Structures are given as structure tokens and as C-alpha cells.
Amino acid sequence: MKNGSMVERRGFWSRFAGQAYLWLILVVLYAPILLIFVFSFTKSKVFGNWTGFTFGLYENLLTGYDYVDQVQVDPNLYRAMLYTVIVALSAAVMSTLLGTLAAIGIYNMRQRDRRIITFMNSIPMINPDILTGISLFLLFVFLGISRGLATVIIAHVVFCTPYVVLSVMPRLTKMNPNIYEAALDLGATPLQALRKVLMPELWPGMISGFILSVTLSIDDFGVTFFTKGSNGLETLSTFIYADARKGGLTPELRPLFSLIFLTILVLLLIINLRTNKQQKSIKKK
């Protein structure tokens, strides 16, 4: 009995320690986001100073004008937002297409070649951003390519594509390997088989890769900083860096961050719910 109670106590404390560690990690990860969200509902220009609940910053962000202080919101913020959306969507679309085709090609390789290419695909993901940024900067200089919007998009495609490959590969491994050949035997062209047979199976992985590419593109600073050139192009990450160097952050960034986070959160929830429904329907069949 004594040994049994000791084992139970050890089990309790080990579970308690594991849960406490998990909650600590969650607090460290999400407390800053929660703080930004909370202080997006106050007009104070000093972060952390609560001056009362208001939607004023959201109104400023949407209208581009601060009616209380009678000043215009920094127009560079909206230019940075526009370039961020252009870069993120362009890079995500191209990365999703290239990553999906690359994943299909890797899947059809021999086992040894597949392992080699998969290992090479993982290198850009573990490579420090600053190293990737400097490497691409030197490449563009060597090739004589003027840095600007196009080079930023190319750079983002380079580091986003491996993540799409990683998102699509599990769907390929779970898929019946004979359905593509069966479609060809039934008279479908390779393009028809790809579009009507493979794509529906890979769609969840492609969507996950697309959303991941968008978030990675929005989040990136190092690669963008070295590939944007000096023609005034700014994304949100480089705008925030330049804004912080001036001595503070534009208050309208708080509601902007909150809206971006909520949008991505809702998209992820929708995708997870849809994936769970599909898995349940497959199990019932």
C-alpha cells in the first residue's frame, strides 16, 4: 500500500509539472499578443498606459485620420500594408504551386533520392533568416538585378516553398498511390488526372501551406531587409523597424496586429474544422 501511494503521488506531481510547464509556455507565447489586443482599445500613444476603453485606434486605422488630435495617420503605414499584402499573396500563390509540384515530384522519386531531396528541402527552413537574406542579396548584386518589389517576392518564394512541400508531402503519403494510374488507364490525360484526382486529395495540405506562406511572409524581416533595395519599398516588418528607430511605434499598429492575428486564427479554425469533418466522413465510409 505504501509503495502504491508513493507511485500515485509521483504520478500526480509528474502530471502537475507537465501541465504547469505547458501553461507556462502558452503564457509566454500568447501574453504579448493578449497585451497588444487589450491596449488596442485605448487611445494612449504610450503602450501600457490605459486611458479608457475606446475604438478610437480602430477608427483611425480604417479612416486614416485621427479626429481627436486632428492629424493624418502616417501614410507610410498604408503603403507598407499594401506592399505586405502584395508580397504575401504573390509569394504564397507561387510557393503553393511550386511546392505542390515539387512534392509530387519528390514523392515519385526512388526512396534514396527522395531522402536526399527531402534533406535538401529542410536546409532553407533551418537556415537563419539573416544568412538567407545576405545570400540572396549577394546573388542579386552578382546578377546585376535591381532590388525592389520583384526581388522581395522572389526571395519570399525561396524560403516559403520548402514549407509548402512539407505541408503537402503527408497528404501524398496517405493517398492511395494507384488512383493516379487508374485515372490514366480510364482515359484521363495527365493534366486531367492531376487536376481532378490528385488536387482534391492534396487540397488540405495546399491550403495549410498557403496560409503558412502568408504568415511567414508577413512575419519576415531579415530576408526582406536585404532584398528590398533603397527605393522606398517598405513592408510592415521593415516599417516597424524604421518606426521603432525613431523612438516609438505608431499606435495604429496595435489594432492592425490584432486584426491580422484574429483573421489568421479564424482561418486556421475553419481549416481544422473542415479537415476534421472530412476525416470523420472518411472513417464512416
Model-derived segments and their meaning:
Residues 8-15, 45, 57-69, 218-276:
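Interhelical loop and adjacent transmembrane-helix boundary motif
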Residues 76-86, 141-164, 205-206, 210:
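Loop-to-helix entry region at the N-terminal start of transmembrane alpha-helices
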Residues 2-10, 15-20, 169-180, 184, ...:
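C-terminal transmembrane helix and the adjacent membrane-cytosol boundary/short C-terminal tail
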Residues 2-3, 31-73, 227-231, 278, ...:
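Short membrane-interfacial helix/loop motifs at transmembrane-helix boundaries
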Residues 2-13, 86-121, 138, 271-276:
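Transmembrane-helix boundary motif in ABC transporter permease subunits
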Residues 4, 8, 55, 63, ...:
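Membrane-interfacial helix termini and adjacent extracytoplasmic/periplasmic loops
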Residues 30-45, 83, 132-144, 167, ...:
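A structural signal for multi-pass alpha-helical bundles of membrane permease subunits
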Residues 20-21, 28-33, 165-171, 175-177, ...:
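Transmembrane alpha-helices
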